């Protein structure tokens, strides 16, 4: 009887202890999807930065974080990378030469060193050049993050339009898309990151990798004509305007939406107007464009232009296609990255672009586009 009573007390007290002990909150899994900041709402300004910080903080010991960043001034992020290094994460960072003297970068260099034979390092691109591009005065304009293992997920890719600066959070509209578990596309970014770090100059670096619902594109791309303009080709070879039944306009016409920092490539504008002539619907929200592009796009019933200027500007670089693409009707696509629709982004700079077929991700971007449009002024 005494033994039975003692066992009962042990079981009861153990259960009570288990019930009273603090529980560890479940770690939210990393999922594919888009994140956007809103510079006009204080609580939403750093949404992209906080997303990246969470992934850095969740990186497993022995895993690898890779970063490629044009402007990097946020010490809150460099501090997280340093802390990750301290707990055994391999941290490899490539930055443009314009970031060389920023405290966030000099602090990382002091912590990680610059020896690429080591497991962790920082590499700064050639002064007044990109890491790969060497035509005219190119820049390493990338903004992406790779996590081999974070928060229980492997092969996590984050492609952003945002630099790691306060202005990119507090003044600029930006986006970031996360793709989880697409090994082929993830590895294409790993290879590109390694090539950026190696700094072998190549003005015709252009490479693509397609797997599942995603495709990566890396620049610079040599050429002088529109048939080597990647965005022009996407529109010219893949977009048709009619025959949709559940997407696009009420009459089944394909809709093309563009949110763009800088738009100056005439062939893209000309193709958009041709598609509008074929009864596609086109909307563009931009910060900067040139006279030729604006004139090409103006004065068409199915093209709507909007500009964001002043204290808050659009820094995103994305295109959304809702309708028929690549012969597939009623599909939804997002094309995003660091790539402005400028000649430098195509021919000179180190840039990355990611095309995704996903109704969920497209609709996330579409909601953001509507927010941009609401914040903009109609041009035509």
Q: For the regions a protein language model found, what residue spans apply to each?
A:
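Amphipathic alpha-helical interface segments
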Residues: 360-380
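Secretory targeting and sorting signals
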Residues: 1-28
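HKD-type phospholipase D/PLD-like phosphodiesterase module
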Residues: 29-63, 71-252, 280-281, 285-332, ...
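Active-site-proximal helices and loops of the catalytic beta/alpha 8
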Residues: 267
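Short, glycine-rich nucleotide/cofactor-binding loops
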Residues: 69-73, 258-264
């Amino acid at each position: 009887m005494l033994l039975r009573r003692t066992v009962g007390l042990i079981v009861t007290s153990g259960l009570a202890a288990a019930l009273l002990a603090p529980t560890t909150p479940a770690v939210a899994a990393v999922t594919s999807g888009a994140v956007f900041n809103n510079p006009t709402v204080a609580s939403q300004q750093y949404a992209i930065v906080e997303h990246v910080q969470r992934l850095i903080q969740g990186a497993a010991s022995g895993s690898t974080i890779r970063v490629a960043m044009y402007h990097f001034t946020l010490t809150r992020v460099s501090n997280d990378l340093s802390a990750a290094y301290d707990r055994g994460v391999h941290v490899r960072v490539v930055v443009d030469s314009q970031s060389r003297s920023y405290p966030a970068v000099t602090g990382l260099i002091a912590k990680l060193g610059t020896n690429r034979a080591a497991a962790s390092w920082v590499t700064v691109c050639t002064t007044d050049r990109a890491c790969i591009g060497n035509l005219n005065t190119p820049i390493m304009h990338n903004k992406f993050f790779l996590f081999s293992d974070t928060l229980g997920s492997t092969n996590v890719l984050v492609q952003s339009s945002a630099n790691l600066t306060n202005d990119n959070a507090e003044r600029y509209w930006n986006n970031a898309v996360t793709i989880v578990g697409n090994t082929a596309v993830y590895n294409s970014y790993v290879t590109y990151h390694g090539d950026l770090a190696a700094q072998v100059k190549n003005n015709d670096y252009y490479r693509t990798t397609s797997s599942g619902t995603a495709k990566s594109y890396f620049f610079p791309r040599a050429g002088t004509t529109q048939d080597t303009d990647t965005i022009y080709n996407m529109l010219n070879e893949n977009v048709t305007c009619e025959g949709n039944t559940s997407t696009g306009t009420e009459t089944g016409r394909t809709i093309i939406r563009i949110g763009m920092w800088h738009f100056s490539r005439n062939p893209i504008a000309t193709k958009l107007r041709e598609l509008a002539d074929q009864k596609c619907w086109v909307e563009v929200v931009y910060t900067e464009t040139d006279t030729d592009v604006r004139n090409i796009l103006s004065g068409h019933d199915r093209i709507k232009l909007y500009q964001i200027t002043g204290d808050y500007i659009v820094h995103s670089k994305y295109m959304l296609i809702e309708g028929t693409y690549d012969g597939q009707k009623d599909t939804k696509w997002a094309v995003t990255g660091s790539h402005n629709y400028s000649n430098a982004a195509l021919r000179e700079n180190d840039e990355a672009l990611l095309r995704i077929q996903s109704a969920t991700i497209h609709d996330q971007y579409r909601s953001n586009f509507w927010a941009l449009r609401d914040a903009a002024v109609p041009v035509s």
